[in-house]
A protein has these predicted regions:
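Membrane-embedded alpha-helical segments of integral membrane proteins
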Residues: 1-62
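Active-site recognition of the HExxH zinc-binding catalytic motif
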Residues: 29, 247-259, 263-266, 270
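Perimembrane helix-loop junctions in membrane proteins
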Residues: 51-65, 69, 122-136
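Membrane-interfacial, low-structure loops and terminal tails that flank and connect transmembrane helices
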Residues: 54-100
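Internal/C-terminal transmembrane anchor helices
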Residues: 99-126
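Membrane-interface segments at or immediately adjacent to transmembrane helices
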Residues: 123-193
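Auxiliary, metal-adjacent structural segments of Zn-dependent hydrolase domains
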Residues: 168-238, 242
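Post-HExxH zinc-binding segment in Zn-dependent metallohydrolases
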Residues: 260-291
Length: 291
């Protein structure tokens, strides 16, 4: 697929899925994409177990026909002949086989639809030119300037200093953990919308990020957030520390605007958080750079 076509798709077609389908899935208080994963596991498990049952039933029927045919030939004193099939197969087994074939055909269609959705909402986005090639989020002055090691060192020190200063302003409990009553999900959504006012590529509708019910599983995979192409949702791991949540949520929301590369999403998440008036979001932005 040509980068030009991919870019056209992201600019003119991909936003339609978020504006329509994303609004529908956004009405649900839970992650629709996560429920789809559960359903997929159940459908696959049923197909496997059903197939095993079919194999066992066929094997038992085959053995019984062989034994019956052997006894019949022995009773006539003749040589062993090929046992007859067809009518000896139970009717319920034939019905079960037909149902299994229909179910398998249904799953083939499901897999085909899944592949189509993954192509349109994920794989195709990887063909889009990078933000560097498109010269997004960069001023002409910065583009013409060459940065050396001294300037990068100064930037590093500035990030660390700002993170340390913000750390002192965070509200903490008796154990020293940072606490906040801020609605991080809605704030992340608002910050991305504000960023969209500055950069047209990020403008438009943003659904509210969803919490993952199986956060423990995602923690084992070292996953802080997940973009579900099947439901156009931004999801996040509720077990991550509170200072990681703002940058993670903005990161996942950026995927809904066609920025599928992780480093680009990290950068956009940083921009959204560092420009926020909420100190927790600013702190999360600087920590995401340090990490």
């Amino acid at each position: 697929i040509s980068p030009q076509f991919a870019q056209y798709y992201v600019n003119h077609i991909f936003p339609l899925w978020v504006e329509s389908y994303g609004r529908v899935t956004g009405l649900f208080p839970f992650s629709v994409g996560e429920m789809m994963l559960y359903l997929g596991v159940v459908l696959a498990a049923v197909w496997i177990l059903w197939g095993i049952l079919e194999g066992v039933v066929y094997g038992v029927s085959y053995v019984r026909r062989r034994v019956k045919g052997t006894k019949h030939e022995q009773s006539k004193g003749k040589g062993v002949k090929q046992p007859q099939t067809g009518s000896s197969v139970p009717g319920w087994n034939r019905s079960l086989c037909r149902a299994y074939r229909k179910y398998s055909l249904f799953l083939i269609w499901v897999v085909g639809i899944v592949c189509l959705i993954m192509t349109l909402n994920c794989f195709l986005l990887y063909q889009v030119p990078t933000i560097t090639d498109r010269k997004l989020f960069i001023t002409q002055e910065a583009e013409e300037h060459t940065y050396g090691a001294a300037e990068l060192t100064k930037l590093r020190d500035e990030v660390v200093e700002k993170a340390n200063a913000l750390a002192l302003k965070m509200e903490r409990d008796e154990k020293g953990y940072i606490v906040s009553d801020l609605d991080i999900e809605e704030t992340a959504r608002q910050e991305m919308m504000s960023l969209g006012e500055m950069y047209p590529q990020l403008s438009g509708y943003y659904p509210k990020p969803k919490r993952l019910k199986t956060s423990a599983f995602f923690s084992q995979q070292y996953i802080m957030g997940y973009y579900f192409p099947f439901s156009m949702e931004a999801n996040y791991n509720t077990m991550i520390y509170i200072t990681n949540q703002p940058a993670t949520l903005c990161h996942e929301l950026s995927h809904l605007k066609g920025f599928i590369l992780e480093d680009e999403a990290n950068f956009i998440g940083y921009l959204a958080c560092v420009g926020s008036e909420e100190e927790l979001f600013q702190y999360s932005a600087y920590l995401s750079v340090i990490a």
